[in-house]
Amino acid sequence: MQDVVTPAGGVWVHWRDYLTLTKPRVVVLMVFTAIVGMFLASPGQVPWVALTVGSLGIALAAGSAAALNHLADQRIDAIMARTRRRPLPSGHLRPLQVLGFSSLLGVAGLGMLALWINPLTAALTFASLIGYALVYTLYLKRATPQNIVIGGAAGAAPPLLGWTAVTGSVDAHALLLFLIVFVWTPPHFWALAVARLKDYERADVPMLPVVYGERFTRWQILLYTVLLLAVSLLPWATFMGGWLYLAAAVGLGGWYLMLNVRLLLTPGPRLPMRSFRFSIIYLFGLFAALLVDRQLPVWLGA
C-alpha cells in the first residue's frame, strides 16, 4: 500500500522507502548494544525514562545519520549492484526529501536526549552522528583504505551512549564496551568488501581489498578477529561478566575465528558473505550474553 504523497511532482512514495533510509537492521543492533550498556551501568533496574526515551533518541539519531549516508553516497549507490535499488538512485525519493527526513529525525532524537536524558549523552550522540554521516561518509570513505578503522569509532558509540544515558558519565567499563564494537567493525565490513569487491572497484571506493588486494584483506580480517577474541575476554577479566559470558565469548569467538581461518584459506565470494553475516550474530550474541549474565540474578530476584 502506498501511503505517502510527495507534493513535488505528485509522485507517490511508499513508506518503506523512508524506512529503508534509516537502515533499520543496523539501527536495531546499535540500539540493542545501547540497551545492554544501560543495564550494565545500572545496579538494579534501568530507569524507565532512560530505557524508553534514551533508546528512542539514540535510534532516531542513528536513523538520521543513516539517511545522510544515503544522501552522500547516492552517486556510489547508483553504480553498485548491491545498492542501486535504494530510494535515491532508484528515483523513489529526491535529495531534499531525504535531507528533510534526516533533519527531522536528528532534531527529534537529539532534542529528546538533551531534554529528558542528559547533555553528555546528547553531545556524544551528536558527535557520533557527525562522525559517521560527515567525517566517515564524505571524507574517510573516499580518502583512505583505513576508512572503516578510523570511522568505526562513530559506529561503536551506542553502548557508550547507553551507559551515559543512565549514569551521566563515562568510565572504563563504558569504554570497554565501545572497544569491543570498535574492534569488531573492521573485519565485519572488510568481509563485505571482499564479497563485493567488483562493486567497490567500479565505484572507485578505496576499500582495503581494492587497494591492497583480497589476500592482504583476508589476513587483516583474521588478525582483527584474533584481537577481537582477546578484547571480548576483558569484560570477564574486569568482572563485568561472569562464567556464562565467558562461555559465550569463547564459543562465539572460536566459531568466528574458525570461519575466518577458512576465509583465509579458501578463495571465492561465499565465505566472505558467511563471515559478514556471522559477525552480526556474533556481536548480538556477545552483548546478549553480557546482558543475561548480569541481569539474570536480578530477574530471578536472587
UniProtKB/Swiss-Prot annotation:
Keyword vocabulary terms for this entry: Cell inner membrane, Cell membrane, Heme biosynthesis, Membrane, Transferase, Transmembrane, Transmembrane helix
Localization per record: Cell inner membrane
Keyword Cytoplasm assigned: no
EC number: 2.5.1.141
Residue intervals passing through the bilayer: 26-46, 48-68, 98-118, 120-140, 148-168, 174-194, 221-241, 244-264, 280-300
Catalysed reaction, written as an equation: heme b + (2E,6E)-farnesyl diphosphate + H2O = Fe(II)-heme o + diphosphate
UniProt pathway: Porphyrin-containing compound metabolism; heme O biosynthesis; heme O from protoheme: step 1/1
Descriptive protein name: Protoheme IX farnesyltransferase
Organism: Alkalilimnicola ehrlichii (strain ATCC BAA-1101 / DSM 17681 / MLHE-1)
